[in-house]
Amino acid sequence: MKVLALRHSVAQVYADTQVYTHDNSKDEYENAFLISNLTTHNILYLNYSVKTLQILNKSGIAAIEIQKMDELFTLIRCNFTYDYIDDVVYLHDYSYYTNNEIRTDQHWVTKTNIEDYLLPGWKLTYVGYNGSDTRGHYNFSFRCQNAATDDDAIIEYIYSDELDFQSFILKKIKERMTTSLPIARLSNRVFRDKLFKTLSVNHDKVVNVGPRNESMFTFLDYPSIKQFSNGPYLVKDTIKLKQERWLGKRLSQFDIGQYKNMLNVLTTLYQYYDMYHEKPIVYMIGSAPSYWIYDVKQYSDLKFETWDPLDTPYSNLHHKELFYINDVQKLKDNSILYIDIRTDRGNMDWKEWRKVVERQTADNLYIAYKYLSTGRAKICCVKMTAMDLELPISAKLLHHPTTEIRSEFYLMMDIWDSKNIKRFIPKGVLYSYINNIITENVFIQQPFKLKTLKNEYVIALYALSNDLNNREDVIKLINNQKKALITVRINNTFKDEPKVGFKNIYDWTFLPTDFETSESIITSYDGCLGIFGLSISLASKPTGNNHLFILSGTDKYFKLDQFANHMSISRRSHQIRFSESATSYSGYIFRDLSNNNFNLIGTNVENSVSGHVYNALIYYRYNYSFDLKRWIYLHSTGKASIEGGRYYEHAPIELIYACRSAREFAKLQDDLTVLRYSNEIENYINKVYSITYADDPNYFIGVKFKNIPYKYNVKVPHLTFGVLNISEQMLPDAIAILKKFKNELFGMDITTSYTYMLSDEVYVANISGVLSTYFKIYNAFYKEQITFGQSRMFIPHVTLSFSNEKTVRIDTTKLYIDSIYLRKIKGDTVFDMTG
């Protein structure tokens, strides 16, 4: 959903668009809630309130002021992520395909021969970091740039088994045009940039679990962030390999040698960050022209010093010459060294060429050892070839993708590795490594142990659901880690599957009720965005690959109506009941009937079940940005910080009724997951609320009427407005509550319209118009620890006779209250009041 705020209406009609005019009779929060539950994708918001826009954005729903028609046209035709703090719109707009172009935000790609393999007549365009170079295309009142690129497809091609790039990119473009936009992946980069910038300012120690290559630029400016990954491939791990021969295999039609060099350097850099927590000088020997340095400098101020007879245009200091062994002494401490020396083969015979390569490999290794032999804080990554070698057992082997798999791999060592025990590695074993293993990640740090960290802020995005992790240990970590943002895969199966397959792995599934967190927000991706100053135009869809975002230690926890709130809670219900269901009242009718309340007159205005909780349960797959457990808990403790004006507080029994209705719904739908979720939420309600029932009552509240439009043979027909189980010492407190609600009680608009048999020989008249006040009084009694109400649903009625009678239907008739009293059952009246 996107909300585009206009001062004046527009004549043009847009598909999937609805107009909402600000309702001045309601406060900003109520307007925001109504907007959020509209069912179209585009909302044109007229006579808007800036405060309402702020509320929507904090809820993760993109809401933007529109000043010009160009802005409206651009935003209505595509999806986007909105930085509502800095007023920046990041479009995810692929309409540039109509210019016969694909786009990249990695400069090195533009220096390859990739355009030789594009679709006929197509070109490649560089658009800068997150599309920053496209800002000039949009002369808007807010900053706007198009962050959409095809880098995901290019990188996927590099790691795939496909060789024909034109066929591959054609397939990917067609997929993009025919399937739902993977909005979370597109906006994730914007989110990660914002997230780590915020956390690094607010927390001294930040730990990040499970980063992948898509984050390789994100962390360049954060050397102090501790990374945990899957660990490196060590020289000693080759003991498991059998010997093989040269294979020779082309991975890419266009030259990706620069990409390989960049990955090698970044892998070395992040290893340095892991060990020393600061930025090094980056020395590079060979590997010209290294256009990828330009990409790195878009994200960081790293300094590069390079040696190569060819130009390296983006180096801070380039020596256009060969590097000799005596030059090693020029290299300073606190540095990394990348050695990528290889003479061109030219017309050399392959046997002669092989001798040259082996000699250069030995020379490269000698430079590496020389560099590491003195000083401190150094790591080296050196080009190697498959040959009989003695290598340190703790050194790391790297084999990032390159244009062709031949004899080349890379060795990474720190000072300690260079002095460690060496092992003889046969050429055939190294060929086996080269032929079978691709390094898929620049982050090769040690795996994370599922234990709480006392002083660190832990971030684990899409990293812990894998069934290689012990599920109970994941839950324990989330429950106990005081400061964290952790995601786990939500269980949106219908058979309550404990794990689901994804690609070639299995993930554990989770529901919010699996966790017993303290002061944590459990929300969706878009709910999490709102907390970090972002909003999004397309909410998460229930694809099966959805995640709960669990934020612990956030100062937003008590701000119940500002973040991870109830916005959009009825949207799915509206979509269904206004298009597919038997009636738009279907939800109200079902909730009453499933709790044995058969008086459906006025059910849409006087419903005895919490619609919030009911919708949050049965449609949790569609809107889990609303943190239901937090909402229940903060109301139960009275600690909710409510900024909005009108805010209805439910009685705990209304929440219980909602769980029962949701359970009935789940049984009819054969939805085992909602069935469990409903049961567990009901158990949670009973845990945080101390609900007691007056199933053996000794007092009741009676309402006597001036007029009863039916025949009756009881002495005094009355409405039993709830029963109590209290001691005589509690009578003054109960009476005080009745006095407090006197005006509201006598102001109830009470009506009746028919009679019926409540049970055998109990003939009653229906009563409407009292439930809202009943639940308010229930809450007042609950807060004073006075037992009020029974475990079964309160069905308002007036007993007319203790005999079997025929049903009578009359025109709806208003009843006027004569008196309201508190009486002991089979005893005397202890309190009486009149209007």
From Swiss-Prot:
Taxon lineage: Viruses, Riboviria, Orthornavirae, Duplornaviricota, Resentoviricetes
Family: Belongs to the rotavirus VP3 family.
Molecular function per GO: GTP binding; hydrolase activity; mRNA 5'-cap (guanine-N7-)-methyltransferase activity; mRNA guanylyltransferase activity; RNA binding
Name of this chain's protein: Protein VP3
Region (N7-methyltransferase activity): 171-245, 429-555
Subcellular location: Virion
Organism per entry: Rotavirus A (strain RVA/Human/Philippines/L26/1987/G12P1B[4]) (RV-A)
Entries under InterPro entries matching the protein: VP3_Rotav
Protein's job: Multifunctional enzyme involved in mRNA capping. Catalyzes the formation of the 5' cap structure on the viral plus-strand transcripts. Specifically binds to GTP and displays guanylyltransferase and methyltransferase activities. Has affinity for ssRNA but not for dsRNA. Capping activity is non-specific and caps RNAs that initiate with either a G or an A residue. Together with VP1 polymerase, forms a VP1-VP3 complex positioned near the channels situated at each of the five-fold vertices of the core.
Catalytic activity line of the entry: a 5'-end diphospho-ribonucleoside in mRNA + GTP + H(+) = a 5'-end (5'-triphosphoguanosine)-ribonucleoside in mRNA + diphosphate; a 5'-end (5'-triphosphoguanosine)-ribonucleoside in mRNA + S-adenosyl-L-methionine = a 5'-end (N(7)-methyl 5'-triphosphoguanosine)-ribonucleoside in mRNA + S-adenosyl-L-homocysteine; 5'-triphosphoadenylyl-(2'->5')-adenylyl-(2'->5')-adenosine + 2 H2O = 2 AMP + ATP + 2 H(+)
Keywords, in A-Z order: GTP-binding, Host-virus interaction, Hydrolase, Inhibition of host innate immune response by virus, Methyltransferase, mRNA capping, mRNA processing, Multifunctional enzyme, Nucleotide-binding, Nucleotidyltransferase, RNA-binding, S-adenosyl-L-methionine, Transferase, Viral immunoevasion, Virion
Parts forming coiled coils: none
Taxonomy, superkingdom: Viruses
